[in-house]
């Protein structure tokens, strides 16, 4: 199945910027956003490393905690309410030097929590405890197919944990495969899917398999095919299910889900855009809101967005008390927290 969300941004959505109680809002109800400067601050010790940020963060949907892998700094932990932030006491040089391209939370069968951190520069994936201790490393899957066996590059850009397996998107290589591993034994399975698309933009293949996200309700793997400005859905066996086109030139880096609504962080934006947007798309594929951090809030670092994620704040009994969107900028790096204002 093929869908096109929008062919013309102007015809599909009017981006509203209003002032309420002295605070600028951007986007369309029910997803209007307000920049939170206080919550966007990171620990002073990592400030020199932020301009080089090339990664993303993971939200633990059990606890609300956030983990953010940052090259040269290690791993930043954030509390459920985003008011507390600290750098985990990482001492392993391999982790400190890693170019963490994204972050994934995964729970082992015994309830222990770990993080998966793909490193596109060092060509591997780290499995790390939630205290920052290195547990294992996944190197290139040399025995998987002729591409890797012949010395093809392994430059992983994202991972997702689903059905007890770790799915690894190799988006910055010529292969563009999705490889599947057992993270607990640090071993690759013999299963993979995808590959490099041609100019015909074949379904099931990728221009850049940049981000991979589990849709929790449908149990699909949604893969942001950045170069082709689209999102492709697959089952856990790698069977292609659906294609959703985004505006040409938007270059989606990754997507995230909250109660059926999709947050899409884009590297650029359609023709005519001077800076990158985050889109909100509903469960029926309709574009219902848009926020552009640079244009709307004057965040000069946000010409390009490299990652965006929903951040619910959980109260007693798991009730969602607030909802934020987190975003990282690229080249230079930056970090922003935007509250969804009801």
Where in the sequence are the language-model features?
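Short loop/turn segments that connect beta-strands within beta-propeller blades
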Residues: 79-83, 129-133, 182-186, 235-239, ...
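Blade-level signature of beta-propeller repeat domains, shared across WD40, Kelch, NHL, RCC1
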Residues: 303-342
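A short helix->beta-strand "capping" segment at the edge of beta-propeller domains
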Residues: 23-50
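Structural motif
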Residues: 176-179, 272-278, 333-339
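Beta-propeller fold detector
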Residues: 31-41, 85-92, 135-142, 188-197, ...
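Conserved beta-strand positions in repeat-built beta-propeller and related beta-rich domains
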Residues: 61, 66-71, 116-121, 129, ...
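Beta-rich, blade/repeat-based domains predominating
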Residues: 45-62, 93-112, 143-165, 198-220, ...
């Amino acid at each position: 199945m093929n869908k096109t969300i929008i062919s013309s941004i102007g015809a599909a959505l009017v981006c509203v910027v209003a002032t309420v109680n002295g605070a600028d809002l951007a986007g369309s109800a029910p997803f209007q956003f307000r920049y939170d400067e206080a919550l966007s601050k990171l620990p002073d010790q990592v400030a020199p490393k932020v301009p080089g940020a090339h990664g993303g963060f993971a939200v633990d949907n059990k606890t609300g905690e956030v983990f953010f892998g940052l090259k040269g700094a290690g791993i930043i932990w954030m509390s459920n309410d985003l008011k507390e932030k600290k750098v985990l006491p990482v001492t392993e040089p391999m982790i400190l030097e890693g170019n963490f391209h994204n972050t994934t939370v995964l729970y082992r069968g015994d309830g222990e929590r770990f993080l998966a951190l793909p490193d596109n520069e060092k060509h591997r994936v780290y499995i790390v405890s939630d205290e920052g201790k290195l547990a294992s490393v996944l190197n290139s899957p040399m025995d998987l197919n002729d591409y890797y066996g012949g010395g093809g590059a392994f430059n992983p850009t994202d991972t997702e944990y689903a059905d007890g397996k770790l799915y690894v998107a190799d988006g910055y290589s010529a292969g563009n495969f999705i490889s599947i591993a057992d993270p607990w034994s640090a071993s690759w399975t013999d299963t993979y899917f995808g590959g490099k698309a041609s100019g015909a933009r074949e379904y099931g293949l990728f221009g850049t398999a940049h981000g991979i996200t589990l849709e929790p309700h449908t149990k699909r793997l949604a893969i942001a095919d950045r170069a082709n400005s689209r999102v492709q859905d697959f089952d856990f066996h790698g069977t292609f299910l659906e294609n959703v086109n985004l505006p040409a030139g938007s270059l989606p880096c990754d997507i995230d889900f909250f109660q059926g609504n999709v947050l899409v962080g884009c590297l650029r934006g359609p023709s005519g855009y001077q800076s990158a947007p985050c889109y909100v798309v509903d469960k029926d594929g309709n574009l219902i809101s848009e926020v552009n951090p640079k244009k709307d809030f004057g965040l000069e670092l946000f010409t390009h967005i490299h990652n965006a994620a929903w951040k619910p704040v959980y109260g007693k009994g798991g009730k969602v008390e607030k909802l934020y969107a987190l975003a990282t900028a690229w080249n230079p790096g930056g970090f922003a927290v935007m509250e969804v204002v009801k």
